[in-house]
Amino acid sequence: MKVAIANRQRRHPIGTPRLRKVAERILSALGYPDSELSVVITGDLGIRRVNREYLHKDRPTNVISFAMAEGEFGALNPAMLGDVIISADTAAREAEEGGVSFWSRLCFLLLHGILHITGYDHERSGEAEARRMEAKEREIFAILEREGLV
């Protein structure tokens, strides 16, 4: 399992080895032990650029995922799942609004992004799929909490 993490912001301290462990545990729980994943932590400005360029939405968001399997050459390397981009700025705001720690929110957004990459969808596939994704989020987040990763 290979998880590459790039922290491209400095405002919010993030332990990348610790975040890598969380990503590896999520992938293991989902049955992807031999996969590869790229995670980028950025600020609102960086994620806004990505959101505008690729999704045509000119605003920051919390997490954006790009699944390699959805691309034109997805079958070339099936082990490469894709990229998860998280805004630490938005995560920090959401953590404060939700009364949870920044770390907890960051890990939840990582989980949410990985679920999208592995085929879960809450936006385009209807209520049943949204409930299935939310149930999987609760299940795996509980594992992370039990194991002291969150």
Curated annotation (Swiss-Prot):
Its cofactor is Zn(2+). It holds the Pfam family YbeY. InterPro entries: MetalPrtase_cat_dom_sf_prd (IPR023091), YbeY (IPR002036). One of its GO terms (cellular component) is cytoplasm. This is Endoribonuclease YbeY. Keywords: Cytoplasm, Endonuclease, Hydrolase, Metal-binding, Nuclease, Ribosome biogenesis, rRNA processing, Zinc. One of its GO terms (biological process) is rRNA processing. Belongs to the endoribonuclease YbeY family. It comes from Geobacter metallireducens (strain ATCC 53774 / DSM 7210 / GS-15). NCBIfam families: rRNA maturation RNase YbeY.
